[in-house]
Amino acid sequence: MKIAVIILNWNGAKLLHQFLPSIIQYSENATVYVADNASTDDSIAVLKRDFPTVKIIQNKSNYGFAQGYNEALQFIDEPYYALINSDIEVTENWLNPII
């Protein structure tokens, strides 16, 4: 079953370093996306340099929470998805109840 994990980000380079590793590690059967809400920090550079397996969706503006996710979902092909905040640390098998 294909599932997308989508993290909304705005100026969260520090949070990406802190929490994205667990999401990547424990989402082995998912495609991980970061939807960036027009960050002005180095979030995009951090993603490209340190997390090359993560797919980046660059929103044109800071759309806020709901619209930011809605904009990102236009680029997702997977039939199922999990929307999570950038300050969430996941644990092993966290996706099992969803799939």
Language-model segments: which ranges?
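A short, amphipathic alpha-helix embedded in the catalytic core of nucleotide-handling enzymes
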Residues: 23, 47, 72, 94-99
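Short beta-strand/loop segment that forms part of the nucleotide-sugar
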Residues: 29-38, 57-59
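Short, acidic, metal-binding catalytic loop of nucleotide-sugar glycosyltransferases
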Residues: 22-30
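Cell-envelope/extracellular polymer assembly enzymes that use nucleotide-activated donors
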Residues: 2-4, 31
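Glycine-rich, basic loop-to-helix element that forms the pyrophosphate-binding segment
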Residues: 59-76
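Short aromatic/hydrophobic "clamp" motif used to bind/position activated sugar donors
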Residues: 81
